[in-house]
């Protein structure tokens, strides 16, 4: 008789979920917990086995270090971590739309890649969520940031005015408090979903408040013009033009004419339109006229650049594209970038003069080199655009793909260097021995050694001829 012939196999499909549910109840009641996680002073009790099974980060902490107390960085939001901890026990994760990037960052730190994949899918399917997150600041910006208290306050106040996050110890009184916490989170998500058509007035009020807190537009502009920054450009190795916000009436000016006189006439038309739209619009000052002239110059310059290079052009991997990273080209590009930065600085100064905006950082005594735009990973940036590019690294976007092998890259120059492998082009040639090289660093090393050998041989030949 074969072993196991008379055995019976019985399965309980919901047994694992029931065990996790009971473990979660024990966690909330503070029973049999063997590890404490500290997030910004908030202490969360949990079980090592559950944490190690759900997160490789916690697995390393409890197995390799045998830690009973784990302190997470202050950049992590306690509310976000509590929901992720609850997810480890229940398998359900409720993510408010404005905080998806916060969940993505926290899951990346905890190495919970299944959560990272889900957050990435949500962001790819709803790009407006990331635009709102990047435009209105992260949840952990310092008070020195111009976007501080923007989205966080509106989110917390919208949930009923509960601005203080409850301590973890206060959530251990039983299953009833767990249900109340779920109801509170559900109400927060419900209030920040897309509003129905019959509540358009409330939606407009929230949009106006969020736009006014951004600090980049005046009072009238924040209520009349709403724009979003392009999130993702089509994969291409062509140099795309920079994104510049041009208001509707000024875009019409760029189409009608490019000379200063036409700009002045259309400015008068714009003035009359603004007067009809609102009774509180101010009369244009000399600074505003100067601002429009500078803006016109910027538009003309970008139009000229667009005429010089089209998106439909094919990249020459055999010639100029390889030389654009040489020392001469690099120096020219740096000078050009400095000139563009100076022009952009003058552009911003005219905006502030026309709209009467004063930077809050000047009152706090910050200099121009202060990094006012922090990321949740701990890094800070001087300009908002730099933080936006940094966020794309967290998302793992690789917009530049190789048409031959399909490999994708985060930077354009990485793709250009990769194409040398497929084309076999060796653009660097030694003037002494005519040997060619594919990579510039190898070429420079060879030139150094080859020059020394050539000079030594030439000196020896001169000595022989002299004798």
Swiss-Prot record:
Pfam family, one: BTB
Location of Phosphothreonine modifications: 423
Protein name stated in the entry: Zinc finger and BTB domain-containing protein 43
Positions of C2H2-type zinc fingers: 373-394, 400-422, 428-450
GO cellular component: nucleus
Span list, region Disordered: 134-153, 162-227
Chain residue numbers at which the record places covalent cross-link Glycyl lysine isopeptide (Lys-Gly) (interchain with G-Cter in SUMO2): 182, 247, 297, 358, 458
Residues bearing the modification N-acetylmethionine: 1
Database matches in InterPro entries: BTB/POZ_dom (IPR000210), SKP1/BTB/POZ_sf (IPR011333), Znf_C2H2_sf (IPR036236), Znf_C2H2_type (IPR013087), ZnFinger_BTB_dom_contain (IPR050457)
Keyword line: Acetylation, DNA-binding, Isopeptide bond, Metal-binding, Nucleus, Phosphoprotein, Repeat, Transcription, Transcription regulation, Ubl conjugation, Zinc, Zinc-finger
Composition-biased stretches (Polar residues): 140-149
Function: May be involved in transcriptional regulation.
Biased composition annotated in UniProt, kind: Basic and acidic residues: 164-174, 182-194
Location in or out of the cell: Nucleus
Presence of the UniProt keyword DNA-binding in the record: yes
Family: Belongs to the krueppel C2H2-type zinc-finger protein family.
Lineage top rank: taxon: Eukaryota
Source organism of this protein record: Mus musculus
Subunit structure: Interacts with BDP1.
């Amino acid at each position: 008789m074969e072993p196991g012939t008379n055995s019976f196999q019985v399965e309980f499909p919901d047994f694992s979920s029931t065990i996790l549910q009971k473990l979660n109840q024990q966690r909330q009641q503070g029973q049999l917990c063997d590890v404490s996680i500290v997030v910004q002073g908030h202490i969360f009790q949990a079980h090592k086995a559950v944490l190690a099974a759900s997160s490789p980060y916690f697995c390393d902490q409890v197995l390799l270090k045998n830690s009973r107390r784990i302190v997470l960085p202050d950049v992590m939001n306690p509310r976000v971590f509590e929901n992720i901890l609850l997810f480890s026990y229940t398998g359900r994760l409720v993510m408010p739309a404005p905080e998806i990037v916060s969940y993505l960052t926290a899951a990346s730190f905890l190495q919970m890649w299944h959560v990272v994949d889900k957050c990435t899918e949500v962001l790819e399917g709803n790009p407006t969520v990331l635009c709102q997150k990047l435009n209105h600041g992260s949840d952990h910006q310092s008070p020195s940031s111009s976007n501080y208290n923007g989205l966080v306050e509106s989110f917390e106040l919208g949930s009923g005015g509960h601005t203080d996050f409850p301590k973890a110890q206060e959530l251990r009184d039983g299953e009833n408090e767990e249900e109340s916490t779920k109801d509170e989170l559900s109400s927060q998500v419900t209030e920040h979903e897309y509003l129905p058509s019959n509540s358009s007035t409330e939606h407009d009020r929230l949009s106006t408040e969020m736009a006014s807190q951004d600090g980049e537009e005046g009072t009238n502009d924040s209520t009349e013009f709403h724009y979003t920054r392009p999130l993702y450009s089509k994969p291409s190795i062509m140099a795309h033009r920079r994104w510049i916000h041009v208001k509707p009436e000024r875009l019409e000016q760029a189409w009608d004419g490019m000379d200063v006189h036409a700009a002045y006439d259309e400015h008068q038309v714009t003035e009359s339109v603004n007067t009809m739209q609102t009774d509180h619009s101010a009369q244009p000052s000399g600074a505003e006229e100067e601002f429009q002239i500078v803006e016109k110059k910027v538009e003309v310059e970008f139009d000229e650049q667009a005429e010089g290079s089209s998106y439909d052009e094919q990249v020459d991997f055999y010639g100029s594209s390889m030389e654009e990273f040489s020392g001469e080209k690099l120096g020219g590009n740096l000078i050009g970038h400095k000139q563009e930065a100076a022009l952009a600085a003058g552009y911003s100064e005219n905006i502030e003069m026309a709209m009467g905006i004063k930077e809050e950082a000047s009152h706090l005594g910050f200099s121009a080199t202060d990094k006012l735009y922090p990321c949740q990973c701990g890094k800070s940036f001087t300009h908002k655009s730099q933080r936006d590019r940094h966020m794309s690294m967290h998302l793992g976007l690789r917009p530049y793909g190789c048409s031959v092998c399909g490999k994708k890259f985060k930077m354009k120059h990485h793709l250009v260097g990769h194409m040398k492998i497929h084309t076999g082009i060796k653009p660097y040639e030694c003037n002494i021995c005519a040997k060619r090289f594919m990579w510039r660093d190898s070429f420079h090393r060879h030139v150094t050694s080859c020059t020394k050998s050539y000079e030594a041989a030439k000196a020896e030949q001169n000595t022989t001829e002299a004798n």
